[in-house]
Amino acid sequence: MSLQQTIEQAFENRNEYSPATMPQDVRDAINQVLEQLDNGTLRVAEKKDGEWVVNQWAKKAVLLSFRLNDNYVQAAGEHIQFYDKVPTKFADWTEAQFKEAGVRVVPPAVARKGSYIAPGAVLMPSYVNIGAYVDQGAMVDTWATVGSCAQIGKNVHLSGGVGIGGVLEPLQANPTIIEDNCFIGARSEIVEGVIVEEGAVISMGVYIGQSTRIYDRETGEIHRGRVPAGSVVVPGSLPSEDGTHSLYAAIIVKKVDAQTRAKTSVNELLRLA
């Protein structure tokens, strides 16, 4: 039986499993998947022929992993302890391992085992959950959170306090995806499997879930669940049909190409909106 088949079958029987009853072959399979997610050789979602494909079986392995162990005390230096069932990614790393990985981790940043942090990425005091993929050159700024199985592209900047939703709680079908070269402004939230396409700029305080209307003021088109590539997005509202009230919406105020994005600062793009 293949690794994928073992995970798929185990997921069907997941309610039968506990740390005490988990079969050894299932335990080994889950740990193998977690190790591959941890070193980046496997991803919960990947782009193939221009479309995002979700490896649902890998996500199922992440969900199963919470049945592997009971909570246990995890020490972090002399004065800090955690009580959890998932180990942290860097708990046993040496200086040589950090240098080889090429990542910068600023205390007290935490990444869970089973997340991947690519070379050149910087974790300010932040949190990266299990199954997440943070690609090369990404900046996860202070108090930003990268949810379980979320996919963060190359050179993405997640500003202070940004929340990128996960798939575990509440259970979601697909991970939230931030494609390459995106900027997510402070305190914004992108959740529920929304895809922010390449080069988009999200202003401070924008909240986008699957039901959020994303209104393009140039075309009048309304998107849901996807921010088109190169969009510059700010918070706003749209009027009701009877004109009695307005409801929140994300507003695409302009589109920029890669050349303009490279020559123009994020602040300028938003200020000129």
Swiss-Prot record:
Its EC number is 2.3.1.117. Keywords: Acyltransferase, Amino-acid biosynthesis, Cytoplasm, Diaminopimelate biosynthesis, Lysine biosynthesis, Repeat, Transferase. It is found in: Cytoplasm. This is 2,3,4,5-tetrahydropyridine-2,6-dicarboxylate N-succinyltransferase. Homotrimer. It comes from Psychrobacter arcticus (strain DSM 17307 / VKM B-2377 / 273-4). GO terms for molecular function: 2,3,4,5-tetrahydropyridine-2,6-dicarboxylate N-succinyltransferase activity; nucleotidyltransferase activity. It catalyses: (S)-2,3,4,5-tetrahydrodipicolinate + succinyl-CoA + H2O = (S)-2-succinylamino-6-oxoheptanedioate + CoA. CDD domains: LbH_THP_succinylT. One of its GO terms (cellular component) is cytoplasm. Substrate binds at R104, D141.
